[in-house]
Structures are given as structure tokens and as C-alpha cells.
């Protein structure tokens, strides 16, 4: 099935209306949950760093920033590694170790930390590339049935609700891989297949530009 512009717009409104619930703050979470989550995070530190900022092995693997994310979104991602709707051979063994309670606790722990960018990447894109990425993020390209990223991911793409994460301050190589995973259907855990449909319409140049622009932005929205 192919969404036409009007149909896709309706789908976007449905998803953002149904899923844009308020993010759980650390103040609303029992301290015992955060303590247990911190203990579980010992499994995550080697790849995602103690700060949750993420890390990378150039040309091999790119580990995302975990902070600044809705905890329910995080739980869904871990569960997806377990059930195979998101494939990553490094993550699956760790995901398989976690109980439902541990997934809940570690996700809330990372959600309670300050959102910080990894320091092991640089954005070397030209101004033209960054401008192209920004245009797609804010305006999309309806001639190709590509909605703006902010239509789902909220103001300045800093995330909204439990299904649309904060996209900013991630390693551009990680963002490129994530989009290509949807294109190649090695990741199928997005609601209504919205990301898969969008990803398949993006060119490699589009993906590079979007990833570069997002990586150039701060991990948390500046006031």
C-alpha cells in the first residue's frame, strides 16, 4: 500500500494525536527504580558510556545516545532487539538478559540523566548539505511523499510522546544506519510502518544531509 500525501497526513495526525503523551520525568519515578536501573546500566556502559552519550567504532558499529529519550520508547527498542523486529547482533545478547522489570528500570534511569552528545564524531558537511538536511527536517518534500521530520518528532525534532524520539545530537553514521535499516527492512518496529515508508523514499544524499544536520544540533533543546 502506498500512502498519498493526504492519506499520509491523516496517518501522521492519527499517530501524533494517539501517541503524543507526556514524557515521564525522573521526579515521577520511584528512587528505587533509578537505583535498580543504575545497577543494570553496568551492562550498557562499555558501549554507550557511563554518561549514556554513546560511542562508535568507525566503519563497524555506532552506538546511540541513550539520554534524552522517553523511557517507554527505550523499553520498546530493547524489546524489539529481543523479538527480532530490530536487528543488531551486538545488542541482542544483552537485551535477552534483561527481564521486563530491568528494561523498565534501566530505561527510566537513562531518562533521568542529562542529555549529552558523544564527543567522538565530527560533522564535516558543507553548508549546502546542512541546509538541505534542515529543509527536509522542517518542510519535507511532498512531491516525493516525504513528510517533515518535525511532523512526527515534534518541535525542532526533539521528540514527542513515546513513539517519536529526540533525533538531535546523535552520531550521523548512526542516524544513517537507522534510516537504512528501515529501507532494508532489518528494522520493522515503527508504528504503522511510517518510518519504513518515508525511508524508502529518501535518497542516499537525503539521508546524509538529514543525519549531518541532526548531528550538528545540541542533544537537548536550548532555552
Language model features with spans:
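Acidic (E/D-rich), amphipathic helical modules within compact regulatory domains
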Residues: 59-134
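Bacterial N-terminal signal peptides that target proteins for export
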Residues: 2-12
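The canonical Cys-X-X-Cys-His
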Residues: 37, 42-50, 106, 146-156, ...
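Gly/Gly-Pro-rich "capping" loops immediately C-terminal to redox-active cysteine motifs
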Residues: 38, 52-81, 92-97, 150, ...
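Bacterial N-terminal signal peptides
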Residues: 10-22
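Residue-level hotspots at or immediately adjacent to binding/recognition sites across diverse folds
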Residues: 191-194, 208
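C-terminal capping alpha-helices of c-type cytochrome domains
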Residues: 96-120, 132, 173, 198-223
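Electrostatic cytochrome c docking/interface patches
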Residues: 24-41, 54-55, 60, 114-142
